[in-house]
Amino acid sequence: MYKLFFRLVFKRMDPEQAHYAAFRWIRLAARIPVLRTFVAAALAPRYKELRTEALGLRMHGPFGLAAGFDKNAVAIDGMAMLGFDHIEIGTVTGEPQPGNPKKRLFRLVADRALINRMGFNNEGSAAVAARLAARNPVFRTTVGVNIGKTKVVPEAEAAADYVKSTEALAAHADYLVVNVSSPNTPGLRNLQATESLRPLLTAVREAADRTVTARRVPLLVKIAPDLADEDVDAVADLAVELGLDGIIATNTTIAREGLGLKSGPELLGETGGLSGAPLKARSLEVLSRLYARVGDRITLVGVGGIENAEDAWQRILAGATLVQGYSAFIYEGPFYARAIHKGLAARLATSPYATLAEAVGAETRKKAAL
C-alpha cells in the first residue's frame, strides 16, 4: 500500500515537501491517544530476544532512527510509535540556521538513494533544548542528540560552538553525538583529522561532565565513509584513548564513482551527501574495520544502506551493537522498523547465537581467526 502511495503521490512531490507532509501526519497520529495506541500495537511489537543494552542504556531493540529526519526534536513520540528503538535527533547547531538554499534534497529512486545538501537546517541548541525540557513523553524511548558546527563559525572556533550545544543539550540527551562528517558544512570534515578531533572531543566531554553531574552522558563521534583506511584506524585509536563511548559508521558519501549508480547525470551531478543502498558496502567495510580495531571496548553503531533485516543482521555480525536507518524509511514507509525487527528475531532464532549480544562482531572475529 505505501509503495503504491509513494509512486502515486510522494514521488510526484518535491522531496523536501513530501518529507514535511509525512512528518506532519506522523506527529498528528502521535497526538491522538486511540490512534497512536493502535499504530504502535501494529508497527512496534516488542521482541524480548532483541532487547539491547548499549551505552549503559536499556533499549527495546537495536534498531533506531538516524539523525537527519527529526532535526528539531518535534516527533520523538511519533517515531517511537513507528517502532524505532532509539531516536537520534539533529543535527543541532549552536546557533539557529536556515541551511542551504533550496532545492537541496533529491531522490535517486532507481538507486534507492538520496542526495542531500541540507546544511544543518535547524532551530539551534537553545530552542531544541527548551523543547526537550518541556517534553512529556508518551513512549519510553532512548533519545540521542547529534550536534554539529554552526556554518558561520570559523573552524578555529568550532570547539566553542560544540561546547555551546553540549551545555544546552547534554542534560536532555540519553547520549550525545559529535558530527564531524557531514559534507554540507564547509570545512567540517577537516575536523575528522585526529589533531583537530582530539581537542574538540576533549572539550565536549569536559562540557558534558560539567553540565550533567548526576550521570555520565555517553559520547560518540560520527564519521564519514570517505575516510582512508588509515584514518579510520586513527579515529578508532583516538576514541579508545579518549574513553569515548562509541563511533557511528557512517555518514553520507561524496563519492559517485564505483557505487554502481543507475540514476542519470542530472541527478548524479547534484552536490551533497549520498545516502541509501549504494552506501551499503563501504559502510559495512568501515564498520568491520572499526570492530577489528576496537573490539568490544566501545559501542559501534552501523548506519548506511540498511534496507532490510538482512542488512541489519550483517552489521551486527560485523560489530554493530546498534543499527540505524533513514533513507530506506523514505522508500519502505511505516512498516520499515517492524520488518527489521521481525527479520532480526527470525535470524537470531535460526543462528548459532543464544543472544543478540553474542552475535555482535561474530563474523569479524571469525575472519580475524583465519
For the regions a protein language model found, what residue spans apply to each?
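Short beta-strand/loop segments at the ligand-binding rim of alpha/beta enzyme cores
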Residues: G56-G64, F139-V145, R210-L227, A292-G302
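An N-cap/entry alpha-helix motif that binds or orients negatively charged groups
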Residues: Y2-T52, N116, N121, S125-A126
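C-terminal helical cap(s) of enzyme catalytic domains, especially alpha/beta-barrels
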Residues: P96-R112, E257-G272, F329-Y353
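Active-site glycine- and acidic-residue-rich loops that bind
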Residues: T150-V163, N190, S196, L220-E241
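Catalytic cores of alpha/beta
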Residues: N72-M81, L227-V240, A292, D296, ...
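Glycine/Thr-rich beta-alpha phosphate-binding loop at enzyme active sites
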Residues: R36-P45, P183-S196, L238-D296
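Glycine-rich phosphate-binding active-site loops on the catalytic face of alpha/beta enzymes
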Residues: D85-Q97, V180-S182, G246-R256, G305-I306, ...
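A gly/proline- and charged-residue-enriched helix-loop-helix capping module
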Residues: G90-R140
